């Protein structure tokens, strides 16, 4: 009879205690508590208390684990049947995660060349400067050309001008920065979500003049996924080197299956500082506004948006040209319609994207202290693109109409252009070798206005 009672006592051995935060001295709930080497465990209650029964009669190691705190273990050496260890305090730990990209189709983002460069998240925040070129200047194969800080333009693998493409979400940016060194890229980096430098076969998906590659910019526009509640975020910055400051604020408001997104940006930059002092007539002012609405469903989304960007900047003077410099005013308005759909009817393809875009760009150049524009440039671009995308392939088509208008002391005639394109991309893996192939067929008509005079 005594032997039986002894076994019962061993089986009912129990340990209890409390778990607290060493930082705040408050109780911790849902801490995982277990005996190493045994299938015995529990979790702490709201007051931090815990209790484990039927523990082994030998000495044992008791472990405590919860996200945000260091793993803690205590060794219990006692012959007592009822064990109370009092309070256990856990130390905070710093969580260090790799960058996480959230998207509707992360599996479709693997089609890229080893020579590609991608900046997003904290990387683009750390390297953010006023212009695209200045933000990318430390990347491999990137150089800068400029006529003042506002007009800085990237040089990609030694090529400039129209030897590579600048795109916004896969379609042309819509400005005239490639036509002259004093034309600024119509982009403020405070609104950029990511920048991708694309080389190799995949570059043909964006256009035909991609000898050096493509720089594709994705802005903080309509997100791929709907927020569960209203969300606000912003970016502020300043520099005492050129007495500049900037701010960008974005607000998302979800309701039912819809979401409204609105954002505004402002940047003021003083004169560029050189080793010889301030370079006159190099200051700039950027202002922008974006508004859009999107509808989300289980297998897709549809959105429409409008964006406005104005840039007023100066070009420094030179003895060979305008001694006092040139002032330039630029305005670009972009309207977008986007439709994304998950598909199953087309083998090997998972998504279909349709995008319509209209860009109205205007650009006036003034001699400093003059009230009339010496040069007046503008263009209107209408684009319609459809694209099917799979894990290792893309096919699509593009229709684009462009109307170029020039006035003042500028002798390029007004011109109409029509571009029809068919493009495709395929990737195939053979053991340790990945092959990529792409093709693009374009039909382009250029019709300048003529005069009998």
How should these model regions be labeled?
Residues 11, 16-28:
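Structural motif
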Residues 20-23, 32-34, 65-69, 81-125, ...:
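Short, acidic, small-residue-rich periplasmic hinge/interaction motif at the N-terminus
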Residues 38-49:
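Short, acidic Ser/Thr/Gly-rich low-complexity loop/linker segments typical of extracellular
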Residues 109-131, 137, 144-190, 199-216, ...:
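Flexible, glycine/serine/threonine-rich loop segments and coil->beta-strand junctions
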Residues 219, 236-242, 255-257, 266-270, ...:
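Transmembrane beta-strands of outer-membrane beta-barrel pores
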Residues 219-253, 279-282:
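Short strand-turn segments of transmembrane beta-barrel domains in outer membranes
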Residues 269-286, 299-352, 356-381, 409:
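Flexible loop and strand-edge segments within Gram-negative outer membrane beta-barrel domains
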Residues 393-453:
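Signature of Gram-negative outer-membrane beta-barrel scaffolds
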